[in-house]
C-alpha cells in the first residue's frame, strides 16, 4: 500500500475524517527539530566510543537550527501538489524536482556558522566546499540523490546533505495537502520526496503504538505497520536484535526474505529517542547486523558510504 498526497480541494469530507484517524503521513514541524537533535547527540556522546563524532554531528544540527530561522523559505506548492498527484509521483521527488539556488545559499550559511567551530581536517573540508563552484555543488547534490556515493567524498557528504535537507524540509513543511493511503507501490521510500528512511519509530502520544519511518532528507514521517519489513513488505522471517535486552529502546528489525534491516526506536522505552541521533549512536548494532549478513536499508544523514563500500 502506498501513500499519496492529495490537494485539499480534492478531498471529500469522509476522506478528511479518515485521514485524521490514523495519519498515514506526518509532515515535518520544524520548530526545535534540529535543536532537539543536537541536544540528543550531545547527550548520547557521553560514554560513547563515537562521542567525538556525535558531538561533531551536534554542531551541524545546531547550525541547521540557526540557518533555518535566518533563511526562511516562502513558496507556493499548490500547483506542484496537483501535478504530482496527477502523475502519481512524490510532490518533492528528488529525481525530478528542479533545485532552486536556495539550497546553496543554505550551504554557505551553514559553512559560515560552522567555521568558527571547526579545526583540522573538518575545517579544510568546509573551506573546500566554500570555494566550490555552483556547478560542482550541483554535481555533488545530483550524485548523492542518485546514490552515487563514490563521486562524493564521505567527509563532504554530510555538509551537502545538511543543506539539501534544510531546503527539502522547508518545502515539505509548506505542503498544502492531505495524505491518503492507497494500494500500489511499497512504502520503503518517503512519499514526499522519494528519499530513504533513516530509521523507524514506535511513537507515543496521539500516535501511540504506531510505527513511522523517518525520512533522512525532508524530515517527513510515514506510517508502516509493525511486524512487516519496511523494505520488501514480507513478515514471515522478521527478527529483532539489540545490544541490551528485550526492553531496549533501540533495536534492529531484520528480514530474512530481502536480507536487510532497519533500526526501530521505541518512545515508550525512552521518550527522548530521536530518529537520527539514536541511529547514529548505535553503530555498534550496525556492525553486529553486518556480521550476521544483513545489509542496511537506510542511510544516516551524518554517515554516508564511502568509495568502495
Swiss-Prot record:
Entry's localization field: Cytoplasm
One Gene Ontology cellular component: cytosol
GO function terms (MF aspect): ferric iron binding
Pfam families in UniProt: FdhE_C (PF24860), FdhE_central (PF24859), FdhE_N (PF04216)
Disulfide links within the chain: none
Record has DNA damage as a keyword: no
One GO BP annotation of this record: protein maturation
InterPro entries given in the database record: FdhE-like_sf, FdhE_C, FdhE_central, FdhE_N, Formate_DH_accessory
Record keywords: Cytoplasm
Chief location of this protein within or outside the cell: cytoplasm
Function: Necessary for formate dehydrogenase activity.
Family named by the database record: Belongs to the FdhE family.
Protein name in UniProt: Protein FdhE
Annotated gene: fdhE
